[in-house]
Amino acid sequence: MAIERTFSIIKPNAVAKNVIGSIFARFEAAGFKIVGTKMLHLTVEQARGFYAEHDGKPFFDGLVEFMTSGPIVVSVLESENAVQRHRDLLGATNPANALAGTLRADYADSLTENGTHGSDSLESAQREIAFFFGEGEVCPRTR
C-alpha cells in the first residue's frame, strides 16, 4: 500500500485545553509520522479562504469566528492509507456520535468546537496542505 499524506488541524478549543502533546502522541502511537507542523492564529480572511466551500451555509460565520478565536496547530501526517486512518482516529464530526477513544470523543466540546479537523480525501489533503505549507516546509522522514 502506498504512503499518503493527510492534513490535520488541532482547533482552538483543543489548543486551549493544552492537549497538543497528547494528540501528537496519539498520532505517533497510531503509526503516523509528523512531517510538517506549525502553530498560527488564523485571520478572518484565512479562515474564510480555507473554509470557502462552506460559504453561504448557516454555520459558516460561526465556524470562521471559532477558528479565529485562538491559535491552531496545523500538521501534515504521513502513513499508509493516511486519510482514512486519520479520519478513523478523529471520530465522527459530531462528537455526540464519536466512538469512545477517538480524538473527538475525548477533546470536542460541540459540533462546531469538535477539537480537530482532518482531510476527507487525498485531493482535499493536497489542497489543504498547500494552503498552509509552502515549498520546503514539509520534511520527508528518511529515518
UniProtKB/Swiss-Prot annotation:
Catalytic machinery residues: H117 (pros-phosphohistidine intermediate)
Stored CDD domains: NDPk_I
Entries under PROSITE patterns matching the protein: NDPK, NDPK_LIKE
Keyword hit for Kinase: yes
GO molecular function, one term: ATP binding
GO CC field: cytoplasm
Binding site for ATP: K11, F59, R87, T93, R104, N114
Pfam families, sorted: NDK (PF00334)
UniProt-listed Enzyme Commission number(s): 2.7.4.6
Keyword annotations of the record: ATP-binding, Cytoplasm, Kinase, Magnesium, Metal-binding, Nucleotide metabolism, Nucleotide-binding, Phosphoprotein, Transferase
Subcellular location: Cytoplasm
Gene Ontology terms: biological process: CTP biosynthetic process; GTP biosynthetic process; purine nucleotide metabolic process; pyrimidine nucleotide metabolic process; UTP biosynthetic process
Reactions that this protein is recorded to catalyse: a 2'-deoxyribonucleoside 5'-diphosphate + ATP = a 2'-deoxyribonucleoside 5'-triphosphate + ADP; a ribonucleoside 5'-diphosphate + ATP = a ribonucleoside 5'-triphosphate + ADP
SMART domains found in the cross-reference section: NDK
InterPro entries: NDK-like_dom (IPR034907), NDK-like_dom_sf (IPR036850), Nucleoside_diP_kinase (IPR001564), Nucleoside_diP_kinase_AS (IPR023005)
Cofactor: Mg(2+)
HAMAP family, sorted: NDP_kinase (MF_00451)
Function per UniProt: Major role in the synthesis of nucleoside triphosphates other than ATP. The ATP gamma phosphate is transferred to the NDP beta phosphate via a ping-pong mechanism, using a phosphorylated active-site intermediate.
NCBIfam families: PRK00668.1 (NF001908)
Quaternary structure, from the entry: Homotetramer.
Family: Belongs to the NDK family.
Name used for this protein in its record: Nucleoside diphosphate kinase
Organism expressing this protein natively: Salmonella typhimurium (strain LT2 / SGSC1412 / ATCC 700720)
